[in-house]
């Protein structure tokens, strides 16, 4: 009842343009091309304004380069010690001098091998395989019995 009333209200309140069942096919076939073309008649789209576009692109590139320089070159002062940090992180001589950490590394050879999960997985696989074999065997048996009954 509720669904019927919702559908009825939908049909009553739907306008022909917004969700109505009456579709105006001729309105769909009309093509609206080049409406408001004059709004695009600016200096950015003219052939004569190549110099303006090139200047804008040059300003963008200069600004991006300035941002990169500020971030990576000019601000790497003595207080940030960027070069020292790079040497510590990436030099081969500092590999022996590792910093101490409270986290223990994951070394696979020294890890205790737990066999209990593998036992559980093998028992589960064995039971699953047994169930599949049992159901196939039972299905064949019932199929053979029904064939025998139909022959009698």
Swiss-Prot record:
Protein name per its UniProtKB record: ESAT-6 secretion machinery protein EssA
Pfam families (alphabetical): EssA
Annotated stretches, region: Disordered: 62-83
Family: Belongs to the EssA family.
Chain ranges passing through the membrane: 115-135
Compositionally biased intervals (Polar residues): 66-80
GO cellular component, one term: plasma membrane
NCBIfam families in the record: T7SS_EssA_Firm
Disulphide-bridged cysteine pairs: none
Function per UniProt: Component of the ESAT-6 secretion system (Ess). Required for the secretion of EsxA and EsxB.
Lineage, opening ranks: Bacteria, Bacillati, Bacillota, Bacilli, Bacillales
Cytoplasmic topology ranges: 1-114
Keywords, comma-separated and alphabetical: Cell membrane, Membrane, Transmembrane, Transmembrane helix, Virulence
Extracellular side: 136-152
Compartment(s) where it occurs, according to its Swiss-Prot or TrEMBL record: Cell membrane
Membrane topology: Single-pass type I membrane protein
Organism: Staphylococcus aureus (strain COL)
Alphabetical list of InterPro entries matching this protein: EssA, EssA/YueC
Domain of life from the UniProt record: Bacteria
């Amino acid at each position: 009842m509720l669904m019927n009333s919702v559908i009825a209200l939908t049909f009553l309140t739907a306008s022909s343009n917004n969700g109505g069942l009456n579709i105006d096919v001729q309105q769909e076939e009309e093509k609206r091309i080049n409406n408001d073309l004059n709004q695009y008649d600016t200096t950015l789209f003219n052939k004569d304004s190549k110099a303006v576009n090139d200047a804008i692109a040059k300003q963008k590139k200069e600004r991006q380069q300035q941002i990169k320089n500020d971030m990576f070159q000019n601000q790497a002062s003595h207080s940030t010690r960027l070069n020292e940090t790079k040497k510590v992180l990436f030099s081969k001589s500092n590999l022996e001098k590792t910093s101490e950490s409270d986290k223990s590394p994951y070394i696979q050879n020294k890890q205790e091998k737990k066999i209990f999960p593998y036992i559980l997985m093998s028992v589960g696989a064995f039971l699953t395989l047994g169930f599949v074999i049992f159901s196939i065997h039972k299905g064949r048996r019932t199929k053979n019995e029904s064939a025998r009954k139909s022959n009698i």
